[in-house]
Structures are given as C-alpha cells and as structure tokens.
C-alpha cells in the first residue's frame, strides 16, 4: 500500500478563494472572479494551483466555458500561445 505524501516544511495548502468569500454558486457573468482562475494566456489554472475542491473546480470550469461562449472571456489560441 503506498504511503501518503507528507507536506514539506514551510509548505502549506493554497487558500480556497471561493470558501474564503463564502461563494456557493459560480456565475458565468462574474468575470472578475473567473479571471482569477485563468492564466495570462487564457488557460484555466489547475486545481493544485488554485486550491479549489474537485467540485468547485468543475463549477468554475463550466462557468469559464460558458463565459467564453458569451464572449466575456478569451479563448486560449495559437496566437495567444505564441505571443502575437
């Protein structure tokens, strides 16, 4: 049976932004909140970076994708990846 990893000294869990603010529903129209979960290239940040729970990450991902469809947030594309 594999052993659990113990955190390294000085390492701590990432703060959960949604839990800190008491947000239970992630709205696709709340662009200011969603931008915190997107990189400068327009990609969705990983859970280990954001500190979200799996369920919260799914909700944020769904909201970001809906906001992209409504042209509120940018899509990551080849031009954004190459710096054009």
Curated annotation (Swiss-Prot):
The organism's place on the tree of life at top rank: Bacteria
A molecular-function term among this protein's GO annotations: small ribosomal subunit rRNA binding
Ribosomal protein recorded as keyword: yes
GO biological process, one term: translation
Leader peptide range in chain numbering: none
PROSITE patterns: RIBOSOMAL_S18 (PS00057)
A GO cellular-component term linked to this record: cytosolic small ribosomal subunit
Keyword rRNA-binding attached: yes
Keyword vocabulary terms for this entry: Ribonucleoprotein, Ribosomal protein, RNA-binding, rRNA-binding
Alphabetical list of Pfam families matching this protein: Ribosomal_S18
Family recorded in the similarity comment: Belongs to the bacterial ribosomal protein bS18 family.
UniProt subunit comment: Part of the 30S ribosomal subunit. Forms a tight heterodimer with protein bS6.
Listed NCBIfam families: S18 (TIGR00165)
Function: Binds as a heterodimer with protein bS6 to the central domain of the 16S rRNA, where it helps stabilize the platform of the 30S subunit.
Name this polypeptide is given: Small ribosomal subunit protein bS18A
Species for this entry: Frankia alni (strain DSM 45986 / CECT 9034 / ACN14a)
Upper classification of the organism: Bacteria, Bacillati, Actinomycetota, Actinomycetes, Frankiales
């Amino acid at each position: 049976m594999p052993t659990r990893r113990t955190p390294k000294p000085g390492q701590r869990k990432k703060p959960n932004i949604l839990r800190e603010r008491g947000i239970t529903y992630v709205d696709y129209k709340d662009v200011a909140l969603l931008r915190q979960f997107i990189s400068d290239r327009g990609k969705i940040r990983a859970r280990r970076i954001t500190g979200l729970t799996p369920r919260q990450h799914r909700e944020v991902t769904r909201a970001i994708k809906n906001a992209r469809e409504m042209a509120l947030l940018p899509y990551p594309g080849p031009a954004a990846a190459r710096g054009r």
